[in-house]
Amino acid sequence: MSSQVVGIEPLYIKAEPASPDSPKGSSETETEPPVALAPGPAPTRCLPGHKEEEDGEGAGPGEQGGGKLVLSSLPKRLCLVCGDVASGYHYGVASCEACKAFFKRTIQGSIEYSCPASNECEITKRRRKACQACRFTKCLRVGMLKEGVRLDRVRGGRQKYKRRPEVDPLPFPGPFPAGPLAVAGGPRKTAAPVNALVSHLLVVEPEKLYAMPDPAGPDGHLPAVATLCDLFDREIVVTISWAKSIPGFSSLSLSDQMSVLQSVWMEVLVLGVAQRSLPLQDELAFAEDLVLDEEGARAAGLGELGAALLQLVRRLQALRLEREEYVLLKALALANSDSVHIEDAEAVEQLREALHEALLEYEAGRAGPGGGAERRRAGRLLLTLPLLRQTAGKVLAHFYGVKLEGKVPMHKLFLEMLEAMMD
């Protein structure tokens, strides 16, 4: 994969309101802090409009609940940062509640962001959560004043999480001591000790993304496929950022990092779909707001992919996959690259062995004293990787066919990764 992969200007799927100086740039990434998986608003089980919630924002002046978009006849002032409906003047400029809260949180928390692309990500309502670095830069460029944020006041009950200014990668290689961890999502039945690597993987797990299907799009399966292409594009860059936070990955040469990502990115994305679908019954959660059953996937233009993905989901459901096991399996899928372009195969093997050892350590703590139970469980988890690769191959082949048809616009990063895998 060429060095241009993370800095390519995308094609645009739809025009969106934005300020005149909104930059046109590359695919963006979401680097919001990880949050606990918790019950949220009911997901969309078709492709209507999506009511976005972000940092306490509900339906805006032009929206109503229930996934339907209702436009007001009143003239609207637009947010100069993302183009959403402005709720007023905040910190000196017309802005929406989401961008106001984002700017305030950034200043009060002294948060520093980095763009994994080219620092020219487009910031719109649809993609404002994709790259926080470029979003903050846009806030400053349109005139938001840092001096307007009081540093002695922080949000109270509305605060959903606290963000760490920076997550430092763990040293690698090295020991991963076990220790207690409060696991998000409620008490565990078995209080297994979690080693430092697992704790780190839980911390750097990306925040959930939304598909945000276009409510104004035409009927038929093409808008659904376009929505998924846009979602995958954003997930790719999130995956790039996530991979760089895995201990040992950043120690690889840049060429090897790209070769690894190029060969397994779809496996990481497919595993994410499967993990989000675990609580569901015969349904696939492509995103928090896009859930399809097998028939719905077929109607959305995915052919038999729904059946293939559900086969993987049921395999993981039978194993009762835990979140700690998921983050380890996801990292192992990354390190399980079979790319022939890897220059330092020994370094990749070292990363894979460290992750395998962490999985064994976690399963040993989960199983308690006894012989062999942890290795049997770890073995069953690892045996899902071939099915994951097979399923990802089917998804790749399907979307490469969509690319060849030329009926659905795709962002260039997604195109680049597709072509690299299929060449």
Curated annotation (Swiss-Prot):
Annotated site, Required for DNA-dependent dimerization, chain positions: 124
InterPro entries the record matches: Est_rcpt/est-rel_rcp, NHR-like_dom_sf, Nucl_hrmn_rcpt_lig-bd, Nuclear_hormone_rcpt_NR3, Nuclear_hrmn_rcpt, Oest-rel_rcp, Znf_hrmn_rcpt, Znf_NHR/GATA
Any single GO BP term: regulation of DNA-templated transcription
Outcome after substituting residue 160 to R: Abolishes acetylation by PCAF/KAT2B
Effect caused by changing residue 413 to A: Loss of coactivation activity. Loss of increased response to coactivator
Region (Disordered): 1-67
Record-stated family: Belongs to the nuclear hormone receptor family. NR3 subfamily.
Protein name as catalogued: Steroid hormone receptor ERR1
Organism: Homo sapiens (Human)
